[in-house]
C-alpha cells in the first residue's frame, strides 16, 4: 500500500464511532453514494455464520436443604417453620426427607437471605 493509504487507515483506526459515522455521511453526500447497499451483503454473510448463544440471567431461584446434622435439627426446624409457615410436624418431616426444596421461584436476594439463615442454623444449603 502507498504511504497515503497507510496514513488514512491509521487515521480511521483512531476515530471514534461518532466521527466514523459523520465521515460516512460526508462521503455519501460528496460522492453521491449509498453506504447501506454493501451492508446487505455483509448481513447475509453474518447470518450464515453461527451466532453465539444468548445467555439469560436466572431470575427465579430455588433454595434446597441438602443435609441437616442431628445436633442442629431443632434450630433448622425453627428456621424452616419461620420461613414457610409450616407446622412443627410438617417442618420436621421436611428436614428429615432432605434434599428438599424449601422455597421455589423466589428472587436472588431473598434466596441468599434464606440460605444464610438456614446455614446459620446448621443446615447445608444450595441455591439453584
Curated annotation (Swiss-Prot):
Q: Which SUPFAM superfamilies match?
A: ClpS-like (SSF54736), Ribosomal protein L7/12, oligomerisation (N-terminal) domain (SSF48300)
* GO-annotated biological processes: translation
Which GO CC annotations does the UniProt entry carry?
chloroplast; cytosolic large ribosomal subunit
Example GO molecular function = structural constituent of ribosome
Pfam families on file = Ribosomal_L12 (PF00542), Ribosomal_L12_N (PF16320)
CDD domains per the UniProt record, alphabetical: Ribosomal_L7_L12
- State its location(s): Plastid, Chloroplast
Instruction: Provide this UniProt record's keywords sorted from A to Z.
Output: Chloroplast, Plastid, Ribonucleoprotein, Ribosomal protein
Description of how the protein assembles with itself and partners: Homodimer. Part of the ribosomal stalk of the 50S ribosomal subunit. Forms a multimeric L10(L12)X complex, where L10 forms an elongated spine to which 2 to 4 L12 dimers bind in a sequential fashion. Binds GTP-bound translation factors.
Function of the protein: Forms part of the ribosomal stalk which helps the ribosome interact with GTP-bound translation factors. Is thus essential for accurate translation.
Family annotation (HAMAP family): Ribosomal_bL12
In the record, the note on similarity to other proteins reads: Belongs to the bacterial ribosomal protein bL12 family.
Q: What is this protein identified as? A: Large ribosomal subunit protein bL12c
Organism per entry: Nephroselmis olivacea
Gene of origin?
A: rpl12
Amino acid at each position: 500500500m502507498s504511504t497515503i493509504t497507510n496514513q488514512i487507515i491509521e487515521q480511521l483506526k483512531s476515530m471514534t464511532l461518532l466521527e466514523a459515522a459523520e465521515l460516512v455521511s460526508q462521503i455519501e453526500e460528496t460522492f453521491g453514494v449509498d453506504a447501506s447497499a454493501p451492508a446487505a451483503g455483509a448481513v447475509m454473510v453474518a447470518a450464515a455464520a453461527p451466532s453465539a448463544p444468548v445467555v439469560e440471567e436466572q431470575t427465579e431461584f430455588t433454595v434446597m436443604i441438602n443435609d441437616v446434622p442431628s445436633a442442629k435439627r431443632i434450630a433448622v426446624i425453627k428456621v424452616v417453620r419461620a420461613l414457610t409457615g409450616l407446622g412443627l410436624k410438617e417442618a420436621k418431616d421436611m428436614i428429615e426427607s432432605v434434599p428438599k426444596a424449601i422455597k421455589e421461584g423466589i428472587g436472588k436476594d431473598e434466596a441468599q437471605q434464606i440460605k444464610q439463615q438456614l446455614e446459620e442454623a446448621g443446615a447445608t444449603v444450595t441455591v439453584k
